[in-house]
Structures are given as structure tokens and as C-alpha cells.
């Protein structure tokens, strides 16, 4: 894959083979920005997990203390009082069968879909449409719930979902390059603590194999996992 001049120049700013203390790695990530826009700061945790094992296939959600810098569009499938709560929480779209019908016609003008348990039987028919896009509501991520007021508020306040991929990685957006380093650090530590809290008991050996941080289109910088817990 051919790399641009800015990408190649950013590689000269750090040692790709070295692991850096958390604070220094965050600083380097901001310095090595390649994109001309306010790029996202992303991290990847490579975990000693087998996604084929049910108890090790991690999936969940958490609220980052400083959000991600991105305002997400939220659609809510609910009726009656719960629909009113969704509107109160400033969900972008609220409906029931009317929204399901729109989605069935390939309407996806939202980032997160929240549904009450009552709506799931009708929505489950659209699994083939929503599943591949990562939009199917799931109890593990808090998007299937009767408390739609709280669900929408959390999403609007910086809640992110995480899921182990086929290679054993958890990818997450920590914020924007414009964020203070302290905010990025606290967001990353929050994710780290969450991953430690849900560590499967069946894990043998080192749980966190490696951690990298980067900005959009920029090279990854390795973080010393030990410095995250300090």
C-alpha cells in the first residue's frame, strides 16, 4: 500500500518498534496527525482472547468521561410513555412500526438504534439489514431496554460500544486531536479499567498483549500497558 508524504514523515517522529509510556504516546499521536481535519484519536487493545469461545467474545458499552467529540444520531423504537421519554431525552428519531418500515427500505440516517423489548420481535426480522452494519440493538450494549430515557442520555453523553474482532482486538475512538491530552488519557484509562473488569476467568497468561494509539490515517504508536494502570 502506497503511503503519502505526511504519513511517511510522521514515521520519522517516533520509533515504530518501541513501546512508549501512556502520556508520551498520547502526545506523539497528536503530533503525528496526518489528516487536515480535526482527526479522531483511536486506540486498539490486542487481547489474549479467542473470539470463537463464547465466554471470551467480549462485547459491551461504557460512557467515556469526556465523550468522543462526535454527536451521534439516535433512533428509538418505542411506544407510549417510553416514546415520550425518548423525545424528552432528545432522541433524533422516535417511532415504532413506522420506523421499522423505513429501515426495511434501507433508511439508515442514524448511528445508534435503541429499542424496547416490546419492539424486538418486529425488529428481529431486519437482522440481516442491521446486523452487518452493527446497528442491531443488543441488551449487552444497553440498546435493548425499557429505560430509554437513560439509554439516550448516555449515548448523547459519550457512550461507546466495544466488541472483540476476529483477530482478538478491541478498537475504540477516544476523542479528537483537539482534545486536551488529559482528556484523552482519562478516556483511555476508563476503557482499560472496563476491559480489566470484564476479563474472562478462562484467560491464561498475559491478558493485554499490546495497545496502540493513532489518529485517523496516521501510523499506530505502541503503548506500554503497564503505564496505563499507573
Swiss-Prot record:
One GO CC annotation: large ribosomal subunit
InterPro entries cross-referenced by the UniProt entry: Ribosom_uL1_bac-type (IPR005878), Ribosomal_uL1 (IPR002143), Ribosomal_uL1-like (IPR023674), Ribosomal_uL1/biogenesis (IPR028364), Ribosomal_uL1_3-a/b-sand (IPR016095), Ribosomal_uL1_CS (IPR023673)
This protein's record includes keyword Ribonucleoprotein: yes
Gene3D superfamilies xref list: 3.30.190.20, 3.40.50.790
Gene Ontology MF terms in the entry: rRNA binding; structural constituent of ribosome; tRNA binding
Keywords (A to Z) from UniProt: Repressor, Ribonucleoprotein, Ribosomal protein, RNA-binding, rRNA-binding, Translation regulation, tRNA-binding
Biological process, per Gene Ontology: regulation of translation; translation
Pfam family, one: Ribosomal_L1
NCBIfam families reported for this sequence: rplA_bact
Self-association state and partner proteins as the record states: Part of the 50S ribosomal subunit.
Function as written in the Swiss-Prot or TrEMBL entry: Binds directly to 23S rRNA. The L1 stalk is quite mobile in the ribosome, and is involved in E site tRNA release.
Family statement drawn from the similarity comment of this UniProt entry: Belongs to the universal ribosomal protein uL1 family.
Name used for this protein in its record: Large ribosomal subunit protein uL1
Underlying gene: rplA
